[in-house]
């Protein structure tokens, strides 16, 4: 099972990725984790990436694809892998295809932006314990106060509506085009590609988590 999970920030990809990886016995691969591991291990690509990051630059797609190819040679990828947050752009997707990285499924978790804004901007957190509430779906007993300690809850900067909207704007411009890219490749093929086209599946990400998970597993049959 080799797949890419697509969806906007706050669509629930992380939750479903965990269930998918457990069911199929595959690792969840994130470029951030790969970069940190390569830098720590002092691999040639890691050294190259560290120079770029230390200078405040963005690591090139060539380096990222090199890290991906190295990562997929690891024994835990024998049964497959799940890409988390990669590719983010069309050039990265093209580079993956050119590098011959095989993908069986591209799964999109679709949640309307207004629902994501409500879901994320309503979160409130008790910092010391990590307990999380939601003003609408799981409110504390007393407004902005932790149920167990009576201490104040906060809204993280990442969850503020303005920040959420900015992240969704970036997603719309950079990553959303991947939906069309992969659905077109799945439907029409690409004679020049080194790998077979993936199957493209789209599921609704609203509702109870277990029902969404059931839809995910049905889509991956």
Curated annotation (Swiss-Prot):
* Annotated region (NMP), positions in chain: 30-59
Domain of life, per UniProt, equals Bacteria
Task: From the UniProt record, list the reaction(s) this protein catalyses.
Answer: AMP + ATP = 2 ADP
Q: Which residues bind ATP?
A: 10-15, 123, 132-133, 207
Q: Where is the signal peptide?
A: none
Q: Where is this chain primarily localised? A: cytoplasm
Q: What is known of its domains?
A: Consists of three domains, a large central CORE domain and two small peripheral domains, NMPbind and LID, which undergo movements during catalysis. The LID domain closes over the site of phosphoryl transfer upon ATP binding. Assembling and dissambling the active center during each catalytic cycle provides an effective means to prevent ATP hydrolysis.
NCBIfam families in UniProt: adk, PRK00279.1-1, PRK00279.1-2, PRK00279.1-3, PRK14527.1
Would you tell me the protein name for this molecule?
A: Adenylate kinase
This protein's species is Cupriavidus metallidurans (strain ATCC 43123 / DSM 2839 / NBRC 102507 / CH34)
């Amino acid at each position: 099972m080799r797949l890419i999970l697509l969806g906007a920030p706050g669509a629930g990809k992380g939750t479903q990725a965990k269930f998918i990886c457990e069911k199929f016995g595959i690792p969840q691969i994130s470029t951030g984790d790969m970069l940190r591991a390569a830098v720590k291990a002092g691999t040639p690509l890691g050294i190259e990436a560290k120079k770029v990051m230390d200078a405040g630059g963005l690591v090139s797609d060539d380096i990222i694809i090199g890290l991906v190819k190295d990562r997929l040679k690891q024994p835990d990828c024998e049964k497959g892998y799940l890409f988390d947050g990669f590719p983010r752009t069309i050039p990265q997707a093209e580079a993956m295809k050119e590098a011959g990285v095989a993908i069986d499924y591209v799964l999109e978790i679709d949640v309307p932006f207004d629902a994501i804004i409500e879901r994320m901007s309503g979160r409130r957190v008790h910092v010391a314990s990590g307990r999380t509430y939601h003003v609408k779906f799981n409110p504390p007993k007393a407004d902005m106060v932790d149920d167990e300690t009576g201490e104040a809850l906060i809204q993280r900067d990442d969850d503020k509506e303005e920040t959420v909207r900015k992240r969704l704007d970036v997603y719309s411009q950079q990553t959303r085009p991947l939906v069309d890219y992969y659905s077109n490749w799945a439907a029409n093929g690409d004679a020049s590609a080194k790998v077979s086209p993936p199957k493209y599946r789209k599921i609704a990400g609203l509702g109870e988590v277990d029902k969404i998970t059931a839809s995910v597993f049905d889509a991956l049959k």
